[in-house]
Each structure stands twice: as structure tokens, then as C-alpha cells.
Amino acid sequence: MGKRIMKKVISSGLVLALAVTMLTGCRFGFASDPDDPNEETKEVPIDTSVDTFEYDTSLSGTSITLLNSKAEIQVALEKMSAEYEKKSGVHVEVMPVTDGDSPYTKVVSLYNSGTPPTASILDTTDVIALAEEKAADLTEEPWVAEAEGYLTEINGKIYSFPLCIEGRGIIYNKAVIEKALGESFDPASVTTQSEFVELLDRLVDAGIKKPVSMAKEDWSLGAHQLQYIYETYEGTSEGAQEIIEDIKAGKVDLSSYDRLSQFLDTFDILKKYNVAKGDPLGADYDEMAIDLADGKTAFWFNGNWAWPNISEAGASEEDAYGFLPYFLNDDKSDFANQKIQASPSKQIMLDGQIATEKEQAAAKEFLSWIVFSEIG
């Protein structure tokens, strides 16, 4: 079972964040600076009063290590690990991968030195490359039944825990659209590329001159977004791999591949209505979030990981943000126009070579605790 790539579009509600990103503080003049020096940072406390999880008391005193390649969640992982230790007696040391280092290179070097982490947060491709030789088999773990559609199987076995389910498309600010048009906005009413353009034109006529935020970062415009031409081949990871191999083998001519031309058509639309059209290389990521939250724009070509930026820019959890698909054509029946892309951006692999039985058991319990305990 390959991980599911296309998920049903959520037509209302918050853009929920599964990762926390840091603001750079850079400004390029597109909007006002949202930073308030008097603002207090507030945290939602974790309710630890209810905990029905059954801990294995024989594991108390065990220490395990977790290699973290997702810097945005380092602090959260440390706090969660501390809570787990209070309950279980198992110490979890969260080891960050140095910014700029390759997670794959890091974990391989640790294996070569004979000191691999008990568990490692890695990219899916890293797990596929390493699992059969180095990982513990997780096929029988209880959380597997809860993760159907997001699991990565390697020759019929599960070697990793799916983490950070992230989706992307066109984020909308519902209140901005409704205020500009003077009517309620139903995201389900926009089903094609032409209908999206019609909505954009209506917003322009209503006074929002450039209703789209589109940041300059190459990881967003290239690495994240160009994947659509593969992922929308037939909507699964297997299909994406199939079209990639066909293109590499010369069976499909990329220049005439319909998903590429459709992708570029939509990209041209976003460029036309881009708030930073006059200076696209000055379109700082954080400024795009500010413009969306302030109502200067109504849409942002991005993923759910952008929520912390939008929140920092002034949005609240009570505001209505959501996703529209990245519309590829005018075919209402095309799944690409009905869904957004979503998949686990990271996987947790457990060491099956060096870790002791107790360490493996503690790492497995930690993963189950994340899923099944009220605290986790």
C-alpha cells in the first residue's frame, strides 16, 4: 500500500499546522510589520490530568535517542518527550540534525560509527533506502491500523511511522473574500480553472487589485509545487513514480505531457494576479503571510505548514482559512480539481541493528503513546 497523495479538499475551517516555522523578520515593503514588541507569547497548556495509556513499567529507566530532521518541531518534541518521561520513566533525547545537513548522511554516519539513534525522523526516500538493512519491523504495531493510506510498505512490511501529514494547494481567507464581494463564500462553488479566474476577476473589480500571494522561495515554487505534474498523473505515489520512470525512459515526452501544460497554465494565472508581480524576487515569504492575514490578498499558493506564519501575521484560530485545489483545467470530474495533495512529509524509523530489546520496546511504546494516549 503506497501513501495516499491526493486527499479530499477541506472546504472550510482552519489551515491546521503540523509544524512550527520561524519568522525571518525581513521586510520588502508589501505590507506593514506585524511584530508587536509588547505582545505576549501564549501557549495552550497540555492537559495531563487524564491518561489511560498503559505503560510498561519494566521499561522505566531506559534511555533512547530520537534523531530529528524537522527543525520546526524540535522544541515541541523536547516538551513532549519530557511529558512522556514523567509518565513512563523512559528518557528520550531529541537530537537535532544540524541546519543544512542531510538527514540521510547524518544517520548513515552514525551507523558507521556504531552509535545510531534508537529512532530517526527521516524523509520517506531515506527510509526506503535504509529500512530493510537497518530498521526494526513495525508491521504488527497497533497504530498501523490507524494510518491506512499513509503507510509506506517495503516488500510487504512496514518499517516507519508516518509523521507530519502536510497538504498544499491554494489557501484562502474566507473573510476577505466575503467582505470584498458582499456575500457568503462557498469554496465548493469553485470547481475549475475558469471558475477560479472568474472569482479572481470579481475580487479585482471589488478593489483587491492583486488577490494572490506568491512567495519567491525556490523550495515552494519549484521543489514543492512542480511535483503536481507527477502526483496528478493518477493520484497515488505509485502513479507518480510510474510517470517519472516513463519520462526518464523517453516513453512520455515531458514537453507534450498534459499535466505540465496544465500546471503552467495555472501558474501563469497566479503570476498574473500576484501581489508582488512588479517585484517577484522581492516577495518575502513572511510578507506574503502578512498580506493574506491583513486582507491585501485573498489567496496564497502554499501548504498547511504556513499556518504559524499566518498566525504570527495576525490571524486567529477562530478565523476561517482553508484550501482550494490547484485547479489544472476546466474538467469538473478531474480529481485534481476536487482534492488537495497531502502526504506524510516525514517518517520515523526505528533501529533494528544496534538498539537493545528494551530500547526498541521503549521506542515502540513512545510511538504508540503519541497515537493512543490522551496526552500524546
Language model segments and positions:
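Sec-dependent N-terminal signal peptides of Gram-positive bacterial secreted proteins and lipoproteins
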Residues: 6-29
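Conserved N-terminal structural module of periplasmic/extracytoplasmic solute-binding proteins
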Residues: 11, 26-126
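Hinge/lid segment of periplasmic solute-binding proteins
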Residues: 40-58, 122-178, 197, 322-324
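Extracytoplasmic/periplasmic substrate-recognition and gating elements
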Residues: 82, 86-87, 91, 96, ...
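Extracytoplasmic "Venus flytrap"/periplasmic binding protein-like
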Residues: 83-147, 153, 175-185, 290-291, ...
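Periplasmic solute-binding protein
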Residues: 130-132, 148-188, 197-201, 215-246, ...
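Short, solvent-exposed loop/beta-turn-alpha elements that line the ligand-binding surface or hinge
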Residues: 136-150, 179, 188-189, 232-262, ...
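Glycine-centered hinge/linker elements that transmit conformational signals in sensory
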Residues: 197-201, 242-281
